Structures are given as C-alpha cells and as structure tokens.
Regions:
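Hot-dog-fold acyl-thioester-processing enzymes
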Residues: 1-62, 105, 109-111, 118-192
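Exposed loop/turn and edge beta-strand positions of beta-sandwich/beta-sheet ligand-binding modules
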Residues: 63, 93, 195
Length: 240
C-alpha cells in the first residue's frame, strides 16, 4: 500500500474489453493511455490543461519514460491510476505514475521526464512559478530509475514502413506518445510479453509522415527505432 502524496492525483477505472489482448490482459498501450490520462486530468484540475496551454502557447512534451509492469491486470479488474510531479529543474519536469489493484499492490509504475515548450518561439522554456507551485513536488517512487538515453545498437533489421494515420494524432497536432509504442510493438513476435519498457522521444511525427521501424535483438532486450525516410529518429523503444 502506497502512502498518498500531497500532490497526487488518482482516478479509478475498470479494465475494459477494448483494452485487453488475446489473454484478456490489459495491453501496454492501454497502460500508457491510463498514465497519460492521469497527468492530463491532473493538469485540467489545476486549470493548467489544454485551454491554458493553448492560451499561453505553452505545452509539456514527453521526452522519455521508463515503465515497469509487475502484473498485467485482467478484464473487469478494478484499478487505481495515480500520478504526481516529483521535481522541476529548468525546462524539465519529472513525474511518476502507478497503477494499483484494489488491495493497493502496484501492478505497474513509471518514471517520466517532460520538457516545457514555448510554442510561439518553438523552443524549451522554464515553467513559471505559478505553474510549478500549482503542481507541487513530492518524493519519487523508491525504485531504480533507468537513464533517459537508450543505447542504440549499430546493426538493425529494417521492417516495412508505416504511415501516420489521422487516428494517431492528438490535440498537439502530433502523433500521440502511445502510438510510437504501438507501432514498435507491431514488429515484435506475437508470443513475446515484456515487463520493462523505455521510450526516448526524439522528434514529433505528424499526419502523413512515414515511419520506418528498425529492430535489433540482444540477449536481454529488444530495441525498435522508428526513423523517417532520411534515417532521422522519431523515437527509440526498448523492451525487456
């Protein structure tokens, strides 16, 4: 059972059929969506959500995250999803997430790094004291956090290209964070189930962009790099 933090946001849900896989377990993209929803709900509750960002021409962009799944919840299981900011430094903000069962056991957790962007100037900027004070800061999870950058192998197998579809675009006009992982998972073998994931976002894909997945398998991990047609990276996804 986790102690509730002063700036923690929590909402309850039930695992839906539309969120499950062949084994009736919650999928990784669904876990990611729950975590994203939690941070969005908290921002909206603070008055710092989509409308605030549009008015002030600011936005939080996800730079990287590490997700660890202890157990995939099953169809119909009641779950709690929580998030809280853990610190701010310059243009960066750190945020933790947990997904718990009704007994308070952690089923999945994540550590993430976000960049605050000035959309008018097209560059990172430091969030105002108003924003920092509203979010607050609490201690991070007592977990071993992986570094932000993912080591990329030199040799890959190039897979079939994928075009970004309309349904993959979010309110920022970019491909949603979850969709990069969903595309990367398509090149994995069907019987593979991983419990640790890292994603490093390099640049945003937009509607119509071509993503070329490149996969490399090592002894203890699988790396999928999503590149454009000039071999520039959109995202690096690591599965363990």
């Amino acid at each position: 059972m986790q102690l509730r933090r002063s700036n923690q946001y929590t909402f309850e849900s039930k695992v839906r059929y539309s969120e499950t896989d062949l084994e009736r377990k919650l999928t990784l993209p669904a876990i990611i969506n729950y975590f994203q929803d939690a941070s969005t709900f908290q921002s909206e509750g603070f008055g710092l959500g989509i409308e605030y960002c549009a008015e002030h021409k600011k936005a939080w962009f996800l730079s990287s995250w590490q997700i660890v799944v202890e157990r995939y919840p099953e169809l119909g299981e009641v779950i709690d999803i929580s998030t809280w900011p853990t610190g701010f430094k310059g243009m960066f903000g750190d945020r933790n997430f947990i997904l718990e069962d009704k007994e308070g056991d952690i089923l999945a957790w994540a550590n993430s790094l976000w960049i605050y962007m000035d959309l008018e100037k097209g560059r990172p900027t430091k969030p105002s004291e108003e924003v920092i004070d509203a979010y607050g800061q609490s201690a991070p999870l007592d977990k071993e956090f992986a570094p932000r950058k993912i080591d990329v192998p030199s040799e890959f197998t190039v897979m079939e290209p994928v075009q970004v579809r309309k349904y993959q675009i979010d309110t920022n006009g970019h491909m949603n964070n979850c969709q990069y992982v969903a595309v990367a998972m398509e090149v994995l073998e069907d019987n593979e189930r991983f419990t640790q994931f890292r994603v490093e976002y390099k640049k945003s894909a937009v509607y119509g962009d071509i993503l070329i997945p490149k996969i490399a398998k090592e002894e203890d991990r699988t790396i999928v790099v999503l590149c454009d047609e000039e071999d520039k990276e959109f995202a690096v996804v690591e599965f363990r």
